[in-house]
């Protein structure tokens, strides 16, 4: 990983803008494993120029009920798409272009804390810390 992946993403975004005058979102991507799932999927290690998370709380679900805890991990979802297109083996490509994703572009600086939660809020960490009693 870069020493400061958020700075690296911002530098790439600025270079693209200065060269082409196009506003883009940049997501630096790696692959990850998911508990109880076969295979890898993409994960955003940083981003710039794109809102990383969409707060869906108080929006309606399919039945018209308000959502209470839903945050959509926009850049992680896009990272999975990009990871699939970039590949994992000898065929891998250094970048992917994802268009018309509906992600919200922004000029504000993205902070690493926006894409993470405290360990005590994480269902995986809590589950490991509190194993079921037999």
Walk through the language-model features, giving the residues of each.
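Phosphate-interacting basic helix/loop segments used at nucleotide- and nucleic-acid interfaces
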Residues: 1-20
């Amino acid at each position: 990983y870069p020493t400061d992946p958020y700075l690296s993403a911002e530098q790439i975004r600025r270079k693209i803008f200065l060269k082409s005058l196009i506003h883009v979102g940049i997501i630096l991507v790696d692959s990850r494993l998911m508990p109880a799932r076969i295979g890898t999927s993409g994960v955003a290690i940083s981003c710039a120029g794109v809102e990383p998370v969409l707060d869906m709380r108080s929006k309606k679900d399919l039945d018209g009920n308000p959502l209470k805890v839903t945050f959509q991990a926009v850049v992680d979802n896009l990272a999975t798409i990009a990871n699939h297109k970039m590949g994992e083996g000898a065929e891998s490509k250094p970048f992917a272009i994802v268009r018309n994703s509906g992600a919200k572009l922004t000029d504000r600086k993205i902070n690493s804390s926006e894409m993470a939660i405290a360990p005590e809020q994480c269902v995986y960490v809590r589950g490991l810390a509190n194993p079921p009693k037999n």
